[in-house]
């Protein structure tokens, strides 16, 4: 497939490649037995479209974030399909496994001789569900639907109205952030993010220390979360409105930020769990079935943690390549890998504290959460510059995303803040949203 500079044609090509990535594993799941040589042959057939998607990604738009997101999704699908075709249920999933697990619906509704199309649709839904929602393999801590929608996500209409209203508010917020980014003085890049600054710790001014503490909080809790969540909501609207998906299968992407008072909770409860099932399944296969580490053991636990974060770092290094940074320049591999060490430290402190207070109630008090949030921000202030400063220098004061229409430029920042606040309170009142 020839690479193109026309965004519309590039989008069409990427959509076709994603369709190939989804249909090949779905077809193999329902037609081949476990350990079939066709499954092994299918993996490179799924990986090649991922390579082409990566090549096409820079031509899709002027938004570095969304181009990188699509490039990484293609690669992530490969890891997901290795699990579905070769690892899960000892040799990969088959149609019989889908029926027994209830993924294909109730057994009475899905006889063994169900039509080929019905089987294919069931398999496709599993392939596109990177978190395994509503399956026996659902990623741990996948957030439930909000109480305002009910456990099943509510009716199609109520789901679409809620998602559309929240997405509109997120769009306004991203519009404001885009304008704020444009107004940042260009000299700040050299002042705060100059080369080598990410590894400087001792000779920092008070202003530089504040930037280090403030930037990770804004980047992870606000900007990155908004960009990912708005993209997820837009996709949910597209799939549910078209009938390709149901509200039940499009659960919230993020948990509550109030749970992020430990590093383990930040990544395991608050942050999205899209990488969790594809990566942990492959890592567990390596450590437990190939290397045969003792289970359960601290060696197994922390080796798995490290390897999962290492894979995440590699994936984000690939993402950084879209903006012209090499894997080494991006700093993503040491950054994400460092969280394995951070979790070891906090697990040790928590174990020591619990041993001293073994006779007391283990409920997490407010003061413990405050201390925990301070710890999370502290660790991120130490390590986030490794990953964020190189990309900040690369975009040089520009935003990593673009919007089709900038309302802030039309009505001005003061009125935009008022609109954002008013609409936000309306959305909060009408749909019971939370942080």
From Swiss-Prot:
GO BP term, pick one: terpenoid biosynthetic process
Disulphide linkage map: none
Cytoplasm in keyword set: no
InterPro entries: Wax_synthase, Wax_synthase_dom
Glycosylation sites: 203, 406
EC number(s) recorded for this UniProt protein: 2.3.1.-
Domain of life: Eukaryota
Membrane topology reported for the UniProt record: Multi-pass membrane protein
Pathway(s) it belongs to: Secondary metabolite biosynthesis; terpenoid biosynthesis
GO MF term list: O-acyltransferase activity
GO cellular component assignments: membrane
Function in brief: Acetyltransferase; part of the gene cluster that mediates the biosynthesis of the meroterpenoids arthripenoids. The pathway begins with the HR-PKS atnH that catalyzes two chain-extension steps to form a reduced triketide, which then primes the SAT domain in the NR-PKS atnG to initiate three more cycles of extension to give a linear hexaketide corresponding to the polyketide part of arthripenoids. The FAD-dependent monooxygenase atnJ then performs an oxidative decarboxylation at C11 of the atnH/atnG product, via an electrophilic aromatic hydroxylation with concomitant ipso-decarboxylation.
Protein name: Acetyltransferase atnC
Native species: Arthrinium sp
Gene: atnC
């Amino acid at each position: 497939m020839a690479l193109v500079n026309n965004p519309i044609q590039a989008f069409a090509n990427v959509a076709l490649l994603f369709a190939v990535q989804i249909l090949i594993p779905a077809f193999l799941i329902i037609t081949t037995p476990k350990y079939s040589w066709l499954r092994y042959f299918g993996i490179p057939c799924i990986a090649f479209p991922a390579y082409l998607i990566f090549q096409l990604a820079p031509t899709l738009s002027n938004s570095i974030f969304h181009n990188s997101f699509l490039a990484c999704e293609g690669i992530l699908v490969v890891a997901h399909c290795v699990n579905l075709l070769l690892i899960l249920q000892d040799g990969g999933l088959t149609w019989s496994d889908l029926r027994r697990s209830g993924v294909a619906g109730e057994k009475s509704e899905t006889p063994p001789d169900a039509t080929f199309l019905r089987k294919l649709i069931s398999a496709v839904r599993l392939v596109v569900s990177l978190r395994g929602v509503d399956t026996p393999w659902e990623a741990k801590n996948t957030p439930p639907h909000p109480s305002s929608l009910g456990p099943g996500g509510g009716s199609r209409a109520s789901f679409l109205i809620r998602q559309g209203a929240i997405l509109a508010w997120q769009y306004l917020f991203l519009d404001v952030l885009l304008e704020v980014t444009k107004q940042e003085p260009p000299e700040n890049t050299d002042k705060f993010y100059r080369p080598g600054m990410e590894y400087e710790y001792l000779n920092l001014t008070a202003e530089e220390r504040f930037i280090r503490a403030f930037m990770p909080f804004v980047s992870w809790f606000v900007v990155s979360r908004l960009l990912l969540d708005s993209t997820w909501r837009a996709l949910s609207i597209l799939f549910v409105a078209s009938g390709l998906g149901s509200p039940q299968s499009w659960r919230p992407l993020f948990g509550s930020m109030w749970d992020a008072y430990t590093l383990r909770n930040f990544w395991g409860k608050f942050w999205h769990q899209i990488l969790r099932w594809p990566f942990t399944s492959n890592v567990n296969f390596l450590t437990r079935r190939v290397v045969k580490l003792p289970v359960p053991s601290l060696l197994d636990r922390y080796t798995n943690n490290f390897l999962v974060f290492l894979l995440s770092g590699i994936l984000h290094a690939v993402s950084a390549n879209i903006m012209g940074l090499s894997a080494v320049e991006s700093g993503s591999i040491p950054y994400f890998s460092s969280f394995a060490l951070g979790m070891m430290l906090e697990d040790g402190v928590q174990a020591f504290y619990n041993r001293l207070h073994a006779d007391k109630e283990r409920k997490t008090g407010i003061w413990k959460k405050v201390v925990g949030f301070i710890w999370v921000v502290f660790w991120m202030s130490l390590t986030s510059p490794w990953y964020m400063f190189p990309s900040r220098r690369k975009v040089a004061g520009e935003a990593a995303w673009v919007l089709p229409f900038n309302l802030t430029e039309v009505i001005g920042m003061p009125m935009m803040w008022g609109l954002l606040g008013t609409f936000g309170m309306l959305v909060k009142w009408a749909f019971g949203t939370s942080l």
